[in-house]
Amino acid sequence: MTALLSVQQLAISTAQETLVESLSFELHAHQALTILGETGSGKSLLANAIIGNLPAGLRSQGKIALFGQYQHQRTQAEREALWGKQLAVLPQEPWHALNPIMRAGEQVAEVHRLVMGNHAASAALTNSAFQQVALHQDQSKYPHQLSGGMAQRVAYLCATQTQAPLLIADEPTKGLDASRRDQIIALLQAQLTRGALLTITHDIEVAEKLGGTIIVMRKGVIQEQGPAQQVLSHPQSDYTKALINADPRYWPTTPQSKTGEPLLTVDNIAMHRGEKCLFDSLSFTLSAGEILGISGDSGCGKSTLADLLLGLLKPSQGRIHRPQAIPVGKALKLYQDPPSALAKSVTLQTLLEDVCRQHTVERSHIPRLLERLALSPNLLSRKANQVSGGELQRFAILRALLTRPTLLVADEPTSRLDPITAASTLQLIIELTQEIGCALVLISHDKLALEKTCHRVLSL
């Protein structure tokens, strides 16, 4: 039987360095293959090479065959003709994949009309699809009105309505709570009834539930390859063992430091979005140096509460009292979607220079933070769209901490990171904020991780 996807000795490089070492694999109908590894290991570059959409400045060697024909034998128009109908992609950044000026329902309906040519049934099929992912009341929303998890599910619908025989899912469960994650996993498993599934993830549990074959990568090099159950039950490489052991269940509890004076008091607030009540009767106090966790399902209002604490929104009722005014630039937010929060037209070095100039920050702090966040200085010469999502996440952390904030709200700060990097990065955020007495609000759908690191956890 001809493989739907055949990769032969594929390597990816820049003019200066090799990013992905030579690797080979095949994927047949009704098979699942998961590429598992840390951020920056070349997983997404592999997907781009298969699609035929490598970023500028990168080149590939080796051969890639889709549906029995080598990609280099196809014209660009012939490659693009596969997109959507034969080869579907669920991208890592859902907000980038969605049209910002189209409502969510319209974008899914457009797939039925333009790609499938099914005008008459597009509305009914779209309604059914949104009900399938528990978003039937959100079709009229624009992408910016969706939470990260909701946007992820809409992007999934756009990618899968054509029922393409080959689906590439890049971090498909990133930012989702456990119940939504399991729902998406079940939908991805349904792909195997009509074709093949290539999944890119750093989530051990996702890899385990999808089964099939696993390739473990680190820094562009294959560490281990084999059946999922065998690799995860009896890992051979030290890296695979470390990846499995980095689950939050095994994290040590962070020692609780002393807190200072109250920074803000939340008094009986409520927040409504149209007819929907996100939360009500919410009261608590946040003190200087305190670590407060906020957990809850996707779309429950976690990010909205963060914006209320920062003064970016006003509550529908109640009030937030700030005994002492926080200076401009000292109440900051680490956004859930760093690629959307960072300018794409300039280098990361320029972004840091802007912060240093605007807030009179010592540039001498940059090398130390780069080292502590495990970021290469070479990254600073690149633009935001030229680095991995996880590296960009850590860069956003560096940029925020440069200003020594009084209040830092971190919205899903480790959602793009593999377990090893997530554990060390979260611990580093805590250490660095505690060193300067900064109040830290951690937003996450991973309640266990919050319970291991926070003074208190608020569940919405």
Regions found by a protein language model. Name each.
Residues 93, 100-114, 337, 344-360:
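Q-loop/switch helix immediately C-terminal to the Walker
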Residues 84, 162, 403:
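Conserved signature/switch motifs of ABC ATPase nucleotide-binding domains
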Residues 156, 184, 397:
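Hydrophobic anchor residue at the start of the ABC signature
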Residues 129-144, 369-385:
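Conserved ABC nucleotide-binding domain
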Residues 132-134, 230-265, 453-460:
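C-terminal boundary and immediately downstream tail of ABC-type ATPase nucleotide-binding domains
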Residues 51, 310:
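Helix-to-loop junction immediately C-terminal to a conserved catalytic motif
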